[in-house]
């Protein structure tokens, strides 16, 4: 089953990390992705630019509303994702717990709905 790991981080805390600390996070994430790829479980993933680079689009009463930044003002913002294919939720949780940012941030595990919406 496919799962999306949504990696949310506190952007202010991320900005305070040293270059070495950030490289440690990136290196650990790359190592995990390489391991999952070798097992055929890694489908896609990438870090995202800061939320200040985001654009939100909404349609209200037939009108397009475009705003700079994320839709919600929260401390943690979506900072990256991993799409994995594993047998079950327990395996997805085990992988999410190995994402380096899980130690200081949040990794949301969400099953991917396949096929037409029901």
Predicted stretch roles:
Residues 1-118:
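Conserved, structured core segments of small domains
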